[in-house]
Amino acid sequence: MKKVLAFFAEGTEEIECLMVVDILRRAGVSVELIAVAPENLVKGSHQITVLCDKNISELSENDFSAADLLFLPGGIPGVPHLEENKKLLEALQKQFQAGKDLAAICAAPGILGRLGFLKGQNFTSYPGFEEGISGVEGAKWSGKAVEVGQQIITGRGMGVALDFALALVERLEGAEKAAQLKKGVQHPECIV
């Protein structure tokens, strides 16, 4: 069974995170929602309190390395809070160096860019958050809804959270599973 760690800090965009967690779990992926905060009850950017499965302080290096994909949702001030966490940044570095997948949506691709992971790659993000990253060492902001690279998948924002989540399902469980879920959740493209 594939494993994903999804990180949730104070001020995270709730829909971007929980849509991905929900869709991945529907696909049969083991997803742990990780609090990047003092407590496991974390308030998102729209004052919705989320009970996370574990706290980042509880995770060992083995917990991180067992994950097939690490996921960073967007939201302000959630993204700055994620980026302040040294343990998370170290885990992202190790995941990237191991050739494993990373995913980020909205403002969160900026974290990957500032870590140097977007060199020579197309990426997308919420408009404005590409500044200082696009053009640096060949990183190119495409502006697409979802950008799927060899190791990194990025999404533009909350409005594309379902399509972003389905792209992660396709990466982890294959195109057939993603198509089944797309139809099952009544994605607009499947309604005739």
Cite the ranges covered by each PLM segment.
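N-terminal beta-loop-helix "entrance" segment that forms/cooperates
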Residues: 34-53
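Active-site-adjacent pocket-lining segments in enzyme domains
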Residues: 3-8, 12, 26-35, 54, ...
